[in-house]
Amino acid sequence: MLEEKKKQESFEIQRIYIKDVSFEAPNTPNIFHVNWIPTIKLNLNTTTKKIKENIFEVVLMVKVTVKIKEDLVFLCDIDQAGIFFIANINEKRLKHCLYSYCPNILFPYARTCISNLVSCGSFPQMNLAPINFDALYHDHIK
């Protein structure tokens, strides 16, 4: 019975934290008087690092760039990180866990932080849509 428990797949969130965050609005206050027809660019990236046996850091990097014509309205980026305990998972499932499941856990935290920063910058509320990290992962491995 004890041997079965040792072999059982295990996943635990140990910590979720902001590793880095930045908000820049270089064209304020003049940009507040411009007709609000922005273009929004969203970039995502994920990095992983094995800290020690069965302990992994996953960092979801989210960068939002908003422009009106050629003028930068604001740039907001966050490195939302988590430390995860993952044991007894084969290599294929481990990669899926690190590059899909963990970013899915981290994204709502990053989205909330970005929304708060944008609001504090006195810009219209920004609600990023949910991201299908499973689809992104499967596209990446093809």
UniProtKB/Swiss-Prot annotation:
<dbReference type="GO" id="GO:0051262">
    <property type="term" value="P:protein tetramerization"/>
</dbReference>
<dbReference type="GO" id="GO:0051082">
    <property type="term" value="F:unfolded protein binding"/>
</dbReference>
<comment type="function">
    <text>One of the proteins required for the normal export of preproteins out of the cell cytoplasm. It is a molecular chaperone that binds to a subset of precursor proteins, maintaining them in a translocation-competent state. It also specifically binds to its receptor SecA.</text>
</comment>
<keyword id="KW-0143">Chaperone</keyword>
<keyword id="KW-0811">Translocation</keyword>
<comment type="similarity">
    <text>Belongs to the SecB family.</text>
</comment>
<comment type="subunit">
    <text>Homotetramer, a dimer of dimers. One homotetramer interacts with 1 SecA dimer.</text>
</comment>
<keyword id="KW-0813">Transport</keyword>
<dbReference type="GO" id="GO:0015031">
    <property type="term" value="P:protein transport"/>
</dbReference>
<dbReference type="GO" id="GO:0005737">
    <property type="term" value="C:cytoplasm"/>
</dbReference>
<protein>
    <recommendedName>
        <fullName>Protein-export protein SecB</fullName>
    </recommendedName>
</protein>
<dbReference type="InterPro" id="IPR035958">
    <property type="entry name" value="SecB-like_sf"/>
</dbReference>
<keyword id="KW-0963">Cytoplasm</keyword>
<dbReference type="InterPro" id="IPR003708">
    <property type="entry name" value="SecB"/>
</dbReference>
<dbReference type="Pfam" id="PF02556">
    <property type="entry name" value="SecB"/>
</dbReference>
<dbReference type="GO" id="GO:0006457">
    <property type="term" value="P:protein folding"/>
</dbReference>
<keyword id="KW-0653">Protein transport</keyword>
